[in-house]
Structures are given as structure tokens and as C-alpha cells.
A protein has these predicted regions:
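Acidic, polar-rich low-complexity tracts and alpha-helical solenoid repeat scaffolds
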Residues: 1-321
Length: 321
């Protein structure tokens, strides 16, 4: 039909049907070769070949055929390196690499999407790039990416992720002022989970302590330390007692530590630090017997492989003098 009656309406319809078949087969190149061989008024323009080659590959991606999509998208980019859909293709290839945990390749491709200036996938590309850099422990780079994400994010989840990422990176890179600002910014979010809210208050309290503004940390420490089942709650309990101790408020420090011991925690390191601080309180009060009792008990029962043993030895050594 197509070759026998090339100018007829029937031939045009048949050619369109044939094109659909080749799209489904993901073989646009063969269709292009055939169409261009017909001569006459039949021309398969490069722009249409660009579009259809991409659409065939995109269909595979949308169906969940990641391996087929990867091959087809790669072929598209090789055939049309400056194609109209190169940014889309790079984004989908990046998503496939990310799903396969090929993070280095995913970051390279997400970066290409961002460099293209195409805004369609900008938000998700910044989100994934920041996540990859964070997972790679490249916190300085991740911090910059989270800043970009915060500036462009419209999705509520990405907005929260940007603020959370900024806060964590600031803390991990030893920037208490930045961490404080980021924590305050995150705490303005209306629908934070209890875990994230607790983490933000913990980071804020630690930032205040680093900035020598300990009194401002008290409210957060008191709130977080209500639940010593969490790692942040256990550390906050110890830090609260330490702040009281540093301010010569032995009574409140002892009360906090006794409550800590009574309620317990799965985080034995911070409980051990609490016992040592309690011994320090008794040493300062001249009650060496009580201090020695706590230290000896801790020495006999603590199983951790960290600096606790040395801290106990140091204090017991001083008590013998």
C-alpha cells in the first residue's frame, strides 16, 4: 500500500500505523531508513526522529523496564547528543543509576541535568545530588546542594529534606552558628515527625553549648531528655546534668542523674558517663566513699570498648592519693 500508492490518504494512514509499530518495537532507526527510502514527498525529518526515538525510550522507562530504557536512552543520547530531550534522557538515566546504587554515575548525570539549565527536573536533581553527596560523606558539597534545593523546592518533602540536610551538614562540619540557624529554620516546619523535631532540638542545644550560650540550651535539653530510650534523649540527660554541674548546681545535677539511673536507657555509654559525673559530684562534696562505690560498680559492669575505662581509672587513681 505505502510503496504502491505513496501519495494516497490510505498510504499516509498506513505509514502512521507502521510508525506506531516501530515505536512499540523501539526501532525508530529502521522506520527512518524505510521512510526515507520511499522518496517523493515522504520525508522523515531529523526533529521527528529525535522526538520519536526519545518517546520510545521513555515508554520503556515508564513501564519499569529499566535495563531496556537504559540502553534506549543511551542510544538516544549517542544519536542525538544535543537532542531536544537530552535533559530528560539524562534525568531518567540518572534515576536508573540511582536505583541501582551506582551513585557516582547518578551524580554525574544529575549534574548534567542541572548544567543544562532545564528547570523541569531541577528540583529532583538537586534533591538526589544532595542525597548522594551526603551518603558519600562529602558534607561540604552536600551543604551547597541542599542550599540550592532549599531555594527551588516546591514539594513539601523536598523543602523539609533541604532544611534537615543543611542542619545535619552544618553540625557534621563543625559550624554551630549555621547549625543553629538551620535547626531554627527546620523547627518552623508545621508537620515534623517527633523524631525529626527531637533531632532539631538536640542540634540546637549542642550549637548553643558550642557557642557558650549554655542557658539557652536548657529548655531543649529538658524536653529531649524526657525520653532516654533515644540516643539524643540519653545524651541530653547527661548534658543537662553536666551543665548543672558546671554551674556548681550539684543538687539539680544529682537529681537529673538519679532520674537517669532510675529510668535507664539502652544507650549504655551515656549512662556510664552519667555514673562518672555522679562520682565527680561526690568527689567535689568530699564523699570519696560514695564516689568510689559508683566507680567500682561501673568498672565491674561496663562492657564498652571506649574511653570509659580510662575515665574510671583516672578518678580512682586520684581517690587513692
Amino acid at each position: 500500500m505505502i510503496s504502491n500508492y505513496p501519495g494516497s490518504e490510505e498510504a499516509k494512514v498506513a505509514l502512521q500505523d507502521l510508525k506506531s509499530v516501530y515505536i512499540e518495537l523501539n526501532d525508530i532507526n529502521s522506520f527512518a531508513a524505510y521512510a526515507n527510502s520511499l522518496g517523493g514527498n515522504v520525508r522523515f525529518e531529523v526533529s521527528e526522529q529525535d522526538s520519536l526515538t526519545y518517546l520510545a525510550a521513555e515508554k520503556l522507562f515508564m513501564r519499569g523496564d529499566n535495563e531496556g530504557a537504559r540502553r534506549s536512552l543511551t542510544n538516544y543520547l549517542q544519536t542525538f547528543p544535543q537532542g531536544a530531550f537530552s535533559s530528560n534522557a539524562n534525568f531518567y538515566l540518572a534515576s536508573i543509576a540511582f536505583a541501582k546504587k551506582d551513585l557516582e554515575e547518578a551524580k554525574r548525570l544529575f549534574s548534567l541535568v542541572l548544567e543544562s539549565g532545564d528547570t523541569k527536573f531541577r528540583e529532583e536533581s538537586w534533591a538526589r545530588k544532595a542525597e548522594i553527596e551526603y551518603l558519600d560523606k562529602d558534607y561540604a558539597a552536600a551543604m551547597e546542594s541542599f542550599k540550592h534545593l532549599q531555594a527551588v523546592a516546591e514539594n513539601p518533602e523536598n523543602k523539609e529534606a533541604a532544611k534537615l540536610g543543611l542542619m545535619r551538614c552544618a553540625e557534621l562540619t563543625g559550624q554551630p552558628q549555621e547549625a543553629l540557624l538551620a535547626a531554627n529554620n527546620l523547627l518552623k516546619e508545621p508537620k515534623l515527625s517527633p523524631e525529626i523535631m527531637s533531632e532539631a532540638r538536640y542540634v540546637r542545644a549542642k550549637a548553643y553549648i558550642s557557642l557558650k550560650q549554655e542557658n539557652k540550651a536548657l529548655a531543649d535539653l529538658k524536653e529531649i531528655s524526657k525520653d532516654t530510650r533515644t540516643i539524643h534523649g540519653a545524651e541530653a540527660k547527661y548534658l543537662l546534668a553536666q551543665l548543672y554541674y558546671d554551674n556548681k548546681d550539684d543538687k539539680n545535677a544529682e537529681t537529673v542523674l538519679m532520674n537517669f539511673i532510675e529510668n535507664g536507657t539502652p544507650h549504655q555509654y551515656w549512662l556510664a558517663r552519667g555514673f562518672i559525673l555522679l562520682a565527680d559530684i561526690y568527689i567535689r562534696q568530699g564523699d570519696d566513699f560514695q564516689a568510689r562505690q559508683y566507680l567500682t560498680s561501673l568498672q565491674n559492669n561496663y562492657k564498652g570498648d571506649d574511653e570509659i575505662a580510662a575515665m574510671i581509672e583516672d578518678r580512682l587513681g586520684k581517690l587513692k592519693k
